[in-house]
Amino acid sequence: MEISYLCAARQADVLELRWMQISDKGIFIQQGKTGKKQIKVWTPRLREALETAQAACPKLSPDALVLYNSDRGQFIRKTFNNRWLKAVRAAQSELNRQLDYTFHDIKAKAISDFEGSSRDKQIFSGHKTESQVLIYDRKVQISPTLDRPVIGKK
């Protein structure tokens, strides 16, 4: 989840991530949907997320998956989504409120939280067009208001 958020990566791109995609520069991700190739540059938080993943799923070989199931194979979507729902329920219990989020919402949250122009967000997210980014960017825009004196009021 953390890797997906920090890299604005889709679920499938994270579940298919292999150790040979990890380099000194960052994490190489070729998005399955758009084919966009990016190296997601290291930040301390991204390194920590990868270390957490490695603690749960030790590196088996360069071509091994970064995240794997109990059989050391790739998670199937249904199993992963069940784990996601379990995590959401735990968060609901801890926060004492309903949470209606899907894993796909993580990418939208990442794009919304990323500081910069819609063009910057396009580069970050790997979308082919700015209009695609605008669909994901859910950040409420701050806009100016009209500040004129009332007519006839002194």
Q: Model-derived features: where do they sit?
A:
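Active-site/catalytic core of tyrosine-dependent DNA strand-transfer enzymes
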Residues: 43-97, 110
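Intrinsically disordered, low-complexity basic tails/linkers immediately adjacent to helix-turn-helix/homeobox/MYB/SANT
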Residues: 153-154
